[in-house]
């Protein structure tokens, strides 16, 4: 089949494991002809969003990538919100896809995709949505955009969509409330991940723990991300420091924003059990998660939580509605420093409970998060 992924309302970043990357990678691996059409938005330094040059090249996920500039007679700050791009209709007509996957519900080119679907009724059009009340329509200008620009575009395009794929329960609520999308048009389609087989998992776990100097008596916690105050890394370190077990270790993977860097250094300077491993590629992070015993994410949401379930980690994560499907007997939902300390104390008292939680995390990942299964879903 011929599949086009339109990443014009979101970023597409080479060498990452975001949902867009994983679905493209799975479609390529399955032998389909895949094209990615993306904006120029990307990460410039693995920390800050920026913009690259338009062009055409072979992407890291195995598909050809066409990057299009923003268009329109507007200042750049507005163009990147309106999300108009030149030549999208011509690309669709030339490539002649069987399936269109439009990533990100909010953008002008959704109309272009819907027009193509209308004139080619055999084509499937799936639109994914990451929007929710925490990240969209939160400020005055953003509310205006969503109400008077994005919503009319979405409403005009709805008759030609096959499904709106929502990454969370909060996203489903948001799409119903703000855009007026009927419940039967919405489908739960969470951020997923790669699930290693037993042999590969044990290999990663054994090799990485040996490399890091851990034996099976150690309980290894891991928190990762682009750390700002919302990630609550400082809360994690404070909670961890209250547990004195010498068999506990805390790994920090990623980059710390300068706004919290001094506090993080102060909190961890006298804590030898805390290690900074720096920035890691997606594959390296997955292997580290296989080596870890518990994934920690008490702050803002990240796709690494789903990756950690695929790596069989029990979790300590923020108590928010979007985590409800993913924390079912395999970890703790926390809303405060005290909650996090309590979770760590329970693990200290009975580390054996992590074994059953690990099995449960694998079960949840297999049921909900396997990108191989999710990629196949987009073909029907």
Predicted regions span which residues?
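N-terminal subdomain of nucleotide-sugar transferases
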Residues: 1-53, 61, 241, 372
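Conserved donor-binding/catalytic core segment of Leloir-type glycosyltransferases
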Residues: 4, 215-231, 237-240, 251
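Acidic donor-binding loop of glycosyltransferase active sites
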Residues: 288-300, 313-314
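A charged, aromatic-enriched C-terminal amphipathic alpha-helix characteristic of glycosyltransferases
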Residues: 351-380
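Nucleotide-activated donor-binding/catalytic signature segment of Leloir-type glycosyltransferases, i.e.
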Residues: 262-284
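Donor nucleotide-sugar binding/catalytic pocket of nucleotide-sugar-dependent glycosyltransferases
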Residues: 38, 124, 143, 151-203
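Glycosyltransferase donor-sugar binding loop
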Residues: 193-194, 224, 249-262
